[in-house]
Amino acid sequence: MTLIYLLLALFAERMLSKPDHCHSNFYIDKYIDWLNKKSYLTQSVSTSGLSLMWLLPGLLLVAALTIVNVSIIDFAVTLFVLYMAIGCPELRNTYKCYLQAANQGDIDTCNIYTQQLGLGQLEPRTFGQHLIWLNYQRYAAPMIMFVVFGLFGVVAYGCLRTLHGYSQANNIHVQSSLSKVLHVLDWLPIRITAFGFLLVGHFSNALPKWVGFLFDTSTHAKLVLA
């Protein structure tokens, strides 16, 4: 059933236009706005409090589905959450605009789109690595989280990633604890994703490097994909 969910979600993500209310960030951003209005997200927030914030939405959703216990509702909600979590049309459209600017040789416009994709300035090698990282976050990570932790994992990972970005942007002092949790959660998915790239790339050349990272717990997840 897990495979069916993933295939249906990927098919829907590719075939259907995804409006704002069908993207996970739409709801997570509203959740963060609510936390701000209630003054829960402040500089004095504790590590345990911040942990509860990214765990709570997933726990509540799973609890609600368990209480309702109707198969068709469980199926529809699970599929919709996966559909929202997988992919990012805004990033895809930005990348298409970047390619158009690159084909026209417009370096200044390329730099603008590069910044929108999360990089400071255009560097071909770094840019390619960053695109791989974005695809991991939007596709591989939520799919693997769903396989390992179910619907709770998809929601919790999305909340954790967004709260981590928010805490970095606002210099919340416990952001380091979120970084450590993300590092642990990304450890297995990033190596599975890297192995997938091995199978479609230079397997014999890259395999020794992949094996070297296999039990490495210190290297940042983004560098493993590089």
Regions found by a protein language model. Name each.
Residues M1-A226:
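Hydrophobic N-terminal alpha-helices or hydrophobic patches in metabolic proteins across all domains
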